[in-house]
Design a protein with these regions (language model features):
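Conserved pre-catalytic core of RNA-dependent polymerases
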Residues: 1-182
């Protein structure tokens, strides 16, 4: 609890908390193709406790902030989105309504989140300066090193994106994307 209080009071995390180790997890296909790996960031345990508190806060309010058609929110199921599309197709066929279905996939979407935009979105949705400052501290000076075959890369400064494997990352992404969808 002292660490959390210190981070909130100081508005910053320690250097060891902001440093991540990226492991590449093989998905499928050709092991020589880097696209067949998913990066996951391993993060300091103290940091994960603090970011877990942020994730819990976000999880509690996201269902009220995110449109009901968005299924990337705790308590909602992907199958709900599938049923909605199926019902829409059925309605259009039954009523003779012309339509089109567009499926968009944002490649490397977690890597493309602009931090300043994300902080503004948090403010737009009513998160206070202490909460936004805490999230901001997660990204100020954040670095990662990639671990491959037992060897570390040089340190990489994280100028944008949310970290794979960080508890609030998917929630911050969904909240940021909601502004673009509405």
């Amino acid at each position: 609890m002292e660490v959390i209080a210190w981070v909130v009071a100081s508005g910053s995390v320690t250097e060891s908390m902001s440093a991540g180790i990226v492991r590449l997890l093989f998905k499928k296909g050709d092991r020589q193709d880097v696209k067949n790996y998913r990066p996951v960031t391993l993060i300091n345990a103290d940091y994960k406790l603090i970011s877990g508190c942020v994730a819990a806060r976000l999880s509690a309010v996201l269902p009220d902030l995110i449109h009901m058609d968005q299924t990337g929110v705790p308590g909602r199921r992907v199958s709900d989105g599938i049923h909605m599309v199926s019902d829409t197709i059925e309605y259009c066929e039954r009523e003779g309504v012309c339509g089109a279905i567009v499926s968009l996939d944002q490649e490397k979407c977690f890597d493309r989140v602009d931090h300043e935009f994300m902080f503004k979105v948090l403010g737009k949705y009513g998160f206070g300066p202490v909460f936004i400052g805490l999230v901001r501290s997660f990204y100020a000076g954040a670095t990662s090193r990639v671990l491959v075959n037992g060897k570390f890369s040089d340190e990489i400064q994280l100028g944008r994106g949310v970290r794979q494997g960080d508890p609030p990352s998917s929630l911050l992404f969904v909240l940021t994307a909601e502004v673009l969808a509405s």
